[in-house]
Regions:
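Intrinsically disordered, low-complexity regulatory segments
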Residues: 1-139, 148, 209, 218-221, ...
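Basic, low-complexity terminal or inter-domain segments flanking catalytic cores
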Residues: 2-4, 15, 150, 160, ...
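Structured, non-catalytic alpha/beta "coupling" segments that mediate domain-domain communication
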Residues: 14-37, 168-215, 383-432, 588
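C-terminal or mid-to-C-terminal helical accessory/interaction module adjacent to the motor/catalytic core
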Residues: 112-194, 244
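Short, hydrophobic-biased segments on the C-terminal half of alpha helices
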Residues: 275-279, 485-486
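A short, conserved structural fragment
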Residues: 282-297, 491-500
Length: 694
């Protein structure tokens, strides 16, 4: 008889089955098989918060099949993912199949390759009860908060709403940022720039200080003009010249959070889209010449550790592709910020076979998986390459009673940047390409220009910056970031506006109520401490039941007080105004949020029940018919697309966003795809890079 190996998915089963051969039967549980009941609390609060698990609806036949296979197998091994959720799935499987959780029937694979599977199978272990209890504690806490708090929101705000231990904090961060933007008062300032000539070349230096070294930043046009007047007839002389060298180091290989952030910035992926592609790469794809294999190590990790074997493989590739000079001459190590012992058991996210290049893989895979593999592979390889070496120069130019400054650098050795550089959300400080200069050199003033500027409010969060904020504040865990963002958007608390996350009126109303009645639930520091307590459960330093009880006692008291405070009261969510008029009665229409998203409703409801689909005019004109306006719409799955308003006669649609810039060749609306703008008019073919912002 063969041994039975149970994993989560058919794809993973297929890949592992290839390596194990005929002595093993590999089958899939299709994810979780048991959970808390959907229709009731399912937790015995009076008896140690004991969860009352039931089989998930629709899994009865699968469970029966698994029991039959286990009964006739020569042993059972549980090979679910090496994390909290995977441990929980294995615990429930052991429970249903009658396996002793203390026996060595649990195996894990950090990478699904021949080597990784062999390594995992050689080290079976008992189920990690601390890891399972950490998952169980989170599940129980989330159920208690959701099940107790959601009905309160239904009564006081609107039916169908939900609140969560972590999602509510995420909404608060987004709402707090919106308040900062609304309350921001811009300050005027002026930049004074001198374009200076040195021989046939010129460069720009900016006013920095007065003669005494006091920083100068004119606050008005009058101040700027006074400085210009003081510079009339002045000589511009190089008064200080500093030369130096600097080394720029690569960023480490990805962890879950940085993978999600970089995929958002570089590829435009949502966190959910990133993790879906990463799961596919981990579980296995069919690669020409290799068959089914996992292309990356496990993608839910907080660890920056890289195995010596992987480092050696990377350096071997770098030497062959770039030369010995491009290999980092020492062993790079990065300190893992906050990983628990269980999390640090994994490596960082890296290619499972470093010598397998993206170009070779691209012959077998495409789309999101190909793009993500290229990014993971490049980042890992770059992390083992030599520093980028730069010569730096900074110059101070004195004129009358003022000092101007400029700085620049020259790359003397590209190092890791020959392969990869991290994308960034912040605008980098501009550095000028300076001509050769000497101390005491007199420069020619070519232009003196003053430009009005205003301080800018903080930017709205993107998925990347929200994930970064959640991580920095210790809110949630990287594996939960994708579902958190999906949930707050699906619930109508937050919406995407040009990749920025903006709170809706509903989201702001709910956040205000939560802040007023349950301040600890949405308190960032409280939530971070809760995560630390749960990490202690995972590392065996705290009892999960006591951790839950410590939270629940305070939460229950807050809920009782909130019911008293809000007795007879209800929070009114203001309707969002629109420019549309009701076709039935002529009253203005307002934007409401329903089960399937936003729609237009007559402000005269309930006297008038007029409704319309909500569409947004992009300002662009259809490139196909040349007449209809381009409208923003949503697919049945909630994805935004753009189509012609004359949809009964014109079938033009695209996922790519129209922009204000017009085609230089034919004058049509341009569309953005990645880093380029293109014209969609048949026969035109015009393309251009996306213009850079100052």
């Amino acid at each position: 008889m063969a041994k039975l190996v149970i994993v989560e998915s058919p794809a993973k089963a297929k890949t592992i089955g290839k390596y194990l051969g005929d002595d093993y039967e590999v089958t899939a549980s299709m994810g979780h098989i048991r959970d808390l009941p959907a229709s009731q609390l399912g937790i015995d609060v009076e008896h140690g918060y004991t969860p009352q698990y039931i089989s998930i609806k629709g899994k009865e036949k699968l469970i029966k099949e698994l029991k039959s296979k286990a009964k006739h197998a020569d042993g059972v091994l549980l090979a679910t993912d090496p994390d909290r959720e995977g441990e929980a799935i294995s615990w429930h499987l052991a429970n249903i199949l009658g396996l002793d959780p203390h026996e060595p029937n649990r195996v894990t694979f950090d990478e699904i390759t021949k080597k990784g599977v062999k390594e995992g199978m050689a080290h079976p272990r008992a189920i990690d009860e601390d890891l399972f209890n950490a998952q169980q504690a989170r599940r129980v806490l989330d159920r208690l908060v959701g099940y107790k708090l959601s009905p309160f929101l239904w009564r006081k705000v609107r039916r169908g709403l939900s609140a969560g231990r972590v999602q509510s904090v995420a909404v608060r961060l987004i709402d707090d940022r919106e308040k900062e933007i609304e309350n921001f008062k811009p300050d005027e300032y002026w930049n004074v720039d001198a374009t200076l000539g040195a021989g046939h070349k010129s460069f720009v230096a900016r006013l920095a200080t007065d003669a005494n070294g006091k920083k100068l930043l004119p606050k008005s046009e009058a101040e700027a003009r006074a400085i210009e007047k003081g510079l009339e007839g002045a000589s511009y002389v190089v008064s200080e010249l500093k030369r130096g060298k600097r080394a720029k180091q690569p960023t480490p290989a990805f962890i879950t959070s940085t993978l999600q952030q970089e995929a958002s910035r570089r590829l435009g992926f949502t966190a959910t889209r990133t993790m879906r592609a990463a799961q596919t790469l981990y579980e296995g794809v069919d690669i020409a010449g290799h068959g089914m294999m996992g292309l990356i190590t496990y993608m839910r990790t907080d660890s920056l550790r890289i195995s010596d074997e992987a480092v050696a493989a990377a350096k071997e590739y770098i030497a062959g592709a770039y030369g010995e000079a491009y290999i980092c001459p020492y062993k790079r190590t990065w300190k893992t910020k906050s990983a628990t012992a269980a999390q640090d058991a994994h490596e960082a996210i890296r290619p499972s076979v470093p010598s397998l290049t993206p170009d070779e893989v691209d012959k077998s895979i495409s789309g999101d998986t190909a793009k993500l593999y290229r990014m993971i592979w490049s980042r890992f390889m770059a992390s083992q390459m030599a520093d980028c070496q730069q010569d730096t120069v900074s110059v101070t130019v004195s004129a009358a009673d003022y000092h101007f400054k400029a700085s620049g650098y020259t790359v003397t050795f590209d190092g890791f940047t020959a392969l990869y550089e991290e994308a960034t959300d912040e605008k980098e400080k501009k550095e000028t390409n300076l001509p050769p200069l000497e101390q005491g050199q007199v420069l020619k003033l070519r232009e003196l220009k003053s430009e009005q500027k205003f301080t800018q409010p903080p930017a709205r969060y993107t998925e990347a910056t929200l994930i970064k904020a959640l991580e920095e504040n210790g809110i949630g865990r990287p594996s939960t970031y994708a579902p958190i963002i999906t949930t707050i958007i699906d619930r109508g608390y937050v919406e995407r506006d040009q990749k920025k996350l903006k709170p809706t009126l509903l989201g702001r109303a709910v956040d205000g109520l939560m802040l007023e009645q349950f301040p600890h639930i949405v308190d960032v520091d409280f939530s971070a401490q809760m995560e630390k307590n749960l990490d202690k459960v995972e590392s065996g330093k705290a009892d999960w039941r006591k951790t839950v009880d410590d939270f629940y006692q305070g939460f229950e008291a807050s809920l009782e007080q909130a019911e008293k405070n809000m007795e007879g009261k209800k929070v009114k969510v203001p309707d969002e105004p629109s420019s549309e008029v009701c076709d039935l009665c002529g009253r203005p229409m307002v934007i409401k949020v329903g089960k399937y998203g936003k729609f237009l409703a007559c402000s005269g409801f309930p006297e008038c029940r007029g409704t319309k689909r909500l569409v947004k005019d992009t300002g662009g004109i259809c490139p196909k018919c040349g007449k209809g306006r381009l409208l923003e719409r949503k697919s049945s799955k909630g994805r935004i697309y753009y189509g012609c308003e004359c949809y009964s006669d014109c079938d033009f649609m695209t996922w790519d966003m129209p922009v204000a810039t017009k085609c230089e060749k034919c004058g049509s609306t341009l569309f953005r795809k990645g880093g380029k703008l293109y014209c969609a008019k048949e026969g035109c073919g015009f393309e251009m890079p996306v213009p850079k912002k100052d």
